[in-house]
Amino acid sequence: MNNAPLTAISPVDGRYHSKTKALQAYYSEYGLIRYRVLVEVEYFIALTAIPLPSLKDFPADQIEALRDLYRNFSEDDALWIKETEKTTNHDVKAVEYFLKEKMTALGLERYLEFIHFGLTSQDINNTAVPLSLKEGIDTVYLPLLDDVIAKIKELETEWKDVPMLARTHGQAASPTRLGKELKVFRERLELQKATLIAVPFSAKFGGATGNFNAHFVAYPEIDWVNFSNHFVNETLGLHRSQTTTQIEHYDHAAGLFDALKRINTILIDLDRDIWTYVSMDYFKQKLKAGEIGSSAMPHKVNPIDFENSEGNLGIANALYEHLSAKLPISRLQRDLTDSTVLRTIGVPIAHSVIAFQSSLKGLGKLVLNEAAISTELENNWAVVAEAIQTVLRREGFEKPYEALKGLTRTHDKVTKTSVHAFIDTLEITPTLKEELKKIEPSTYLGIQLVGK
C-alpha cells in the first residue's frame, strides 16, 4: 500500500485527487509542517531585527538562506521531521530540531537557542494554520468560486429575456425570466463572498498562557505586545488576537467556516433548482460520446454533476458546522481537542472545491429547451389572474380578487379562451377589456432585473 489515489481512504485524496491536488500545498501534513517552518524562521528573523542583544551580530547575509529553508522545503525535509517526531512525540519540537540542524549546517550554532525562543507550540500552530487557511482560500478556493459566479452571470445574461413559469409551493405562480432566477443565485453568492472576505484570519501569539511570561522575564524592557502585533499583522499578514489563553479563541475562524457553509448552502439551492428544471425538461444536457447514464437503461442522461456537487457540499457543511461549533470551546486555558479538529480544515474545503468544479461542469452542459418552457407557460393561463385583478383594483372594480378566484381556483383548465370569455362578462369599458386581453403569461413578466 502507498499514498496513491487508488489506496487513499478519503475520496478527496482518492477518487477526486485530480480535483483537489492544488490544495495539498496548504492542507496536507507536508503543508502544515512547511508553514510551521515558515513561522519559526520569520519569528527568528524578527528577533534579529529588534535586535535581541545576543543576536546583534547575526550575519545579515544569512537571512535569505534561512528563508530558503521554507521556500525550498522538500518532502524529504518533511520526512526528516516526521521521523524525528517518532522520538519527540511532539510535532512542533521536531520542527525546532530540524531548524537547529539546518542552522548548524549554515555555521550558525551560536544562535540555535533563539529558534522557538519564549514560544509555546500553539504560537506556531495558531499562526501556521490560519496562514495556510488564508493562502489556500485566496489561491484555490476564491478563484474557483469566482468561476462559478462568472458562469452563472454568463447564463443569466444569455437567458435574460427567456420568459418562464415561476413555481411557489411547487405550483404555478406569476411568470418570471430565467435570467433573473439565475441572478438571484449570483447576487447571493457575491454577497456571501464579500462577507467571507471580511472575516479576519486571526492568530494567537503570546507565549504559554498568553501573557508573554517567558519573553518578559528574559527581556522586560522590550514591548512584546507591539513586537507580536507587528510580526503577526505585518510580517505574516494575519490578525493578532490581543488577549488569549494558550490558544487562539477561534471566534473569527468560526465566522469563517459559517461563511463558507452559507456559500455552500446557496449552491445546494442552485443545484437542486437546476436538477428540477432538468427533470421538467427545461434543460437538455450536452452529450459526450462514450458516456453511460445507467448500467440498465441506455437512454438515461442524468444530471450527475449537480448531484455530485450537492453531495459534496452537504459533507462539507457537516464538517464546517462542527468546526464552527467546536473550535471556540476549550477547557480552561487549553485542551488538545482543537488540534485534531484543525487537521481536518482542508477536508471541507476540498469537498467544496470538488463541488464547485462539478457545478461548473454541469452548468456548462446545459442546453436550453425553450419549446418546453414556452409550452408550460402557455398551459398555465391562470397565472394572469393576478394581473387582471390588480388592474381591476386600480379601476375601482368591486371584489376583483373574488371574481378571479371563481374563475381560476377550480379543477377546470384555464385557457386563453376562458380568460378572454371571462373578461367579456365584466361590466367595464371596451378600452379596459382590450387592455386586459393584452395580458399574456409570456408578457406578464414585471421589471427586467438583469442588467439593473
Per-range role (PLM):
Residues 2-212, 219, 223-230, 293-294, ...:
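A helix-coil-helix interface module used to build multimeric assemblies
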Residues 37, 88-92, 145-152, 182-196, ...:
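Alpha-helical transition-metal enzyme core signature, strongest for iron centers
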Residues 57, 281-288, 357-375, 398-405, ...:
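A glycine-biased, small/acidic residue-tolerant capping/turn segment at secondary-structure junctions
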Residues 121, 216-220, 240-247, 373, ...:
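A structural signal for small-residue-enriched, beta-sheet-centric alpha/beta enzyme cores
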Residues 157-179, 285-300, 331-340, 364-379:
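Glycine-rich cofactor-pocket loops
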Residues 222-246:
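Active-site-adjacent "gating/activation" loops or surface patches in catalytic cores
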Residues 247-282, 286-287, 291-348:
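A conserved active-site cap/scaffold subdomain adjacent to cofactor or substrate pockets
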Residues 308, 312-399, 403:
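Long, amphipathic alpha-helical stalk/connector segments used for oligomerization, subunit docking
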